[in-house]
């Protein structure tokens, strides 16, 4: 059976490995392995490769080591985690730290699923390369990326079992320890043998003759639960300690005691002034002495309380009573200082200053009236009041009827040098030049603003300045619209400068573009339609046109995907014709859905092989030790005579290729 799977050291890899064997040269650092799908089929490794046919994933090596049984074998290991997948694996490649492909191999086809596909697994890939000198290869990798495989763990466990690399035991960790039969050792690193344990047990099993304990030495002691003993040879039991604590807990603390019941304290003598606690007897005696010292003052207080009816709210009662009294004021004094006389009327000339004025008959008549209406009638002002009731007030008012201006009247608002005016121009009846005008002036800053107010919200609708009209809300024009000229297109259209050049709506969802009354473009239902040629450039032009005679519509589409970033494709309703595609490696391919038929085949004939054949037969005699085939030839026969050395014939024929009308012998590597 022929060998189907193999590993090949590339030409570049062999050169690097050979150079690394020279003294003082840097070792080859193999750091990375890549996997590929071979472009969809099992590839054959080639020493001339500089990369995989179609790489799908690469990562740093998990392990690189020298084979234990074959000293010139180097084993490289790659681990693919479960979350990586979704591809076929048919080829492997080893790369050094400079990115050079050192070795390439094919492998049995295997699909690596991704977790998102519902299945996942760890997968280990190994490549074995044979080198003439292992010393030329760096066998260390970044340990932060290493993951232990099952084989690695098994090897390390077996190696550890055969080694003596185990820690010694200590008081905090397990480990190896040395035995000892000593019974008086203070070591904390030796372990006692059964012999030492037995000796200690036999000693402990004998009679104990220890002495009693005293206040000066350790020893045996007897327990006691007594709480009033003065012994210095007995030891208190927990019961005795609890009894004492229970009694202690019944006592009040020295600092801020919380007393209950009716505690008593000694009565201090009268006149004592310190921090001693005062009992009720001391307080009552002090109060009695105070009363006896000033009997007249207490009697006065008793009499005052009786006079007030023993009112406990005396202060509130007095405040309420004073609240209704007239405060003392200079106003009454000012009025009281006036001299009374007939036909005199008092009035104030200043703060708390009064004077008298002469009261006339009219004044007496007005004062005699009981209503405002009577005063108005007396003064003859009724007509004036009637007119004022329907007048527009100077400080602002609301008109309930119409307001009419005659002739060329102007309604103006003026402040300093700024103004706003509304006027009407009409020279005579029947005048054809009648109009209403609006004028503002503010040193060139004037403009007209039309605004609307709803509730508390104000919104600007339009502004008109000296050089621009700005409409701030949606505007509806029922008819055609012309910019700089009248509109000749009619309907719902806009013309720009030229009366028949612009845009026109010619139906639901249809917008046409006109130039000199000629329809040149249409936008309809998401489609742009050109009724004339589409031209790019003004001197050397690129033109796109249609004669409208094709049986199918043509589509030129630019699209892309993750595996095909850029595709420029031409096709019709039946399928695609050709496309140009940029790949993920930035290369470009051109594909035709059919046969290419150039008018001149010369370019193809000069570049491609049209036929292959075996050329004229060549015969060579074989000498002892063998003979290699000629360059570019293959052996087609042998003629073995066997009588003498050098009379056997080897028949060769050259391998020839036919290019552009000429047969060429193939070259040999």
Curated annotation (Swiss-Prot):
Entries under Pfam families matching the protein: Gp34_trimer (PF21446), Phage_fiber_2 (PF03406), Phage_tail_fib (PF12571)
Q: Name one GO cellular component term.
A: virus tail, fiber
Stretch list, region Disordered:
251-272
Tell me which family the UniProt entry assigns to this protein: Belongs to the tail fiber family.
Q: Which InterPro entries match?
A: Gp34_trimer, Phage_lambda_Stf-r2, Phage_Tail_Fiber_Structural, Phage_tail_fibre_N
Compartments where found: Virion
One biological process term from GO is: symbiont entry into host cell
Name the cystine pairs.
Answer: none
Q: What is this protein called?
A: Probable tail fiber protein
User: Among its keywords, does the record have Protein transport?
Assistant: no
> What are the alphabetically sorted keywords of the record?
Host-virus interaction, Late protein, Viral attachment to host cell, Viral tail fiber protein, Viral tail protein, Virion, Virus entry into host cell
